[in-house]
Amino acid sequence: MPFCMPKINPEIETFARIKVIGVGGSGGNAINHMISSKVKGVEFICMNTDTQDLHKSLADKKIHIGKNLTKGLGAGMNPDVGKKAAEETKAEIQDTIKGADMVFIACGMGGGTGTGAAPIVARAANEQGILTVAVVTKPFSFEGNQRMKLAENGLSELEKEVDAILVIPNDRLLMIADKDTGFKQAFALCDEILR
């Protein structure tokens, strides 16, 4: 029996529409690393309350969340501000992710924007029936107990809204770095892992 190639109807999309969203400073850094590393086949979106960070983004689509609330100055390590900022901009977030088959959310937990806004972004995706996966980092222990507590609370909120979550404790990354790794290099390593 001869082998026959199946007929492909060009009108049927054969690839999943994947959107990768970097939320907050760490998420934006991760997006920039992915773009610089020539990751293809996905749409990159950066969301932040801090307009200076947003201007540094290489993403095609940038969303300034919480314009009225933060005036572009960031969330000040306050997840409640990050949450309210995302809620203020929820309609734009929903429009941006519309049509995706899968959404990846990249962010760092323990600050204001990523910690507070990521669960709202995830909820917007879930409400549209989009498979939603979060890839997040937890703070280094040297960043202090307050930041770790914010991270734990944020993770608890995010877990309720995603289909799957990958948590990367930054302290574990130090195990693969050598003893001469500086702070800046350690944070760059975190961005590389999120990529």
Question: Predicted regions span which residues?
Answer:
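Tubulin/FtsZ superfamily GTPase core signature
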Residues: 1-195
